[in-house]
Amino acid sequence: MEKQEDFKLNTHSAVYYHWRVWELTGLMRPPGVSSLLYVVYSITVNLVVTVLFPLSLLARLLFTTNMAGLCENLTITITDIVANLKFANVYMVRKQLHEIRSLLRLMDARARLVGDPEEISALRKEVNIAQGTFRTFASIFVFGTTLSCVRVVVRPDRELLYPAWFGVDWMHSTRNYVLINIYQLFGLIVQAIQNCASDSYPPAFLCLLTGHMRALELRVRRIGCRTEKSNKGQTYEAWREEVYQELIECIRDLARVHRLREIIQRVLSVPCMAQFVCSAAVQCTVAMHFLYVADDHDHTAMIISIVFFSAVTLEVFVICYFGDRMRTQSEALCDAFYDCNWIEQLPKFKRELLFTLARTQRPSLIYAGNYIALSLETFEQVMRFTYSVFTLLLRAK
């Protein structure tokens, strides 16, 4: 039964939900679907929603005259535009996404061949964490969408789901009002699905990288550990040669891990940098909004500002947290090469081990924009910067 479970190991299932979203929103053509029909479907969906939805928000922003309204609309517009840029980036890196899937198949096959229960458990744990992250983001987006709908329903006067400009009179035309709200609801649902995948696939890929590093760490620590099987019918020299071959296989596994990290770096560099820029801009805008509406005692607007501030802060924290986990695991992987039983081994074993240690001394990190490390230290610096800006704005007021 355990062997059957090992055979079913598929770490790419960590991004199963994301892949389905990308297929649904026109980025990845599902198998068996006509290429022409899918292109038409993709262009239609993305033209109607991905392009038109943020343009309507941007147009409304240009017609805003008061500072409080400008800050509120700017917060929503920045968030939506950056979310669409992250979504577009998925299309740009789709070749790398397919390469990751192929590489994961090789690494999964290796884990199944080794067949260690602890390795399999570590990989499945990271898959579950990645899928749980997607479900958490999905719950947040469902709650936000529902809250927007309830807000429109309970308001005594007419109001749109989001402040947008459509060039028609919807205040005095019931037909226009209903049609615009139907479009906004459809666009909001599609955008929420897109954003859910865009916000949760960086931590999902970081979980995959962490899981395979953990599996390799366990594999390396077992190198040179003599078992009852190795003690029976095997000479000491034959055992040492076998251990050397185990090291060579682990070095090949390490090369695959490094290759996976390089591809993930290319995939995550742009969206993570966009998220940092978006968070900084939204946090500063929310601070301005909070300061201006506080005098008007507009508690609803204050709550919305706090929600947006919390949301963008959470998005940065998540990628920094999982990036920090990956760095810690890379350090543990380096330590594993020190902890293996290298003392009894052949000279060529020790030579290969020294070369490998030289390559693993530097901890692995993913960099946003190839510059900003995804770590908890970075998150702390972002929070300090935000507090400094807020204090400066408060004094200026």
Curated annotation (Swiss-Prot):
Transmembrane segments: 39-59, 73-92, 132-150, 177-197, 273-293, 302-322, 364-383
Keyword Cell membrane: yes
Tissue: Expressed in 20 sensory neurons on the distal edge of the antenna.
Family: Belongs to the insect chemoreceptor superfamily. Heteromeric odorant receptor channel (TC 1.A.69) family. Or2a subfamily.
GO biological process, one term: signal transduction
One GO cellular component term: dendrite membrane
Keyword rRNA-binding carried by entry: no
Protein name: Odorant receptor 2a
Domain of life of the organism encoding this protein: Eukaryota
Subcellular location(s) per record: Cell membrane
InterPro entries: 7tm6_olfct_rcpt
Extracellular domain ranges by topology: 60-72, 151-176, 294-301, 384-397
Lineage, broadest ranks: Eukaryota, Metazoa, Ecdysozoa, Arthropoda, Hexapoda
Further details from the record: The atypical heteromeric and topological design of the odorant receptors appears to be an insect-specific solution for odor recognition, making the OR/Orco complex an attractive target for the development of highly selective insect repellents to disrupt olfactory-mediated host-seeking behaviors of insect disease vectors. Odor-evoked OR currents are independent of known G-protein-coupled second messenger pathways.
Residue spans, topological domain Cytoplasmic: 1-38, 93-131, 198-272, 323-363
Membrane topology: Multi-pass membrane protein
Pfam families the record matches: 7tm_6
UniProt GO MF annotations: ionotropic olfactory receptor activity; odorant binding; olfactory receptor activity
Subunit organization: Interacts with Orco. Complexes exist early in the endomembrane system in olfactory sensory neurons (OSNs), coupling these complexes to the conserved ciliary trafficking pathway.
Keywords: Cell membrane, Membrane, Olfaction, Receptor, Sensory transduction, Transducer, Transmembrane, Transmembrane helix
Function summary: Odorant receptor which mediates acceptance or avoidance behavior, depending on its substrates. The odorant receptor repertoire encodes a large collection of odor stimuli that vary widely in identity, intensity, and duration. May form a complex with Orco to form odorant-sensing units, providing sensitive and prolonged odorant signaling and calcium permeability.
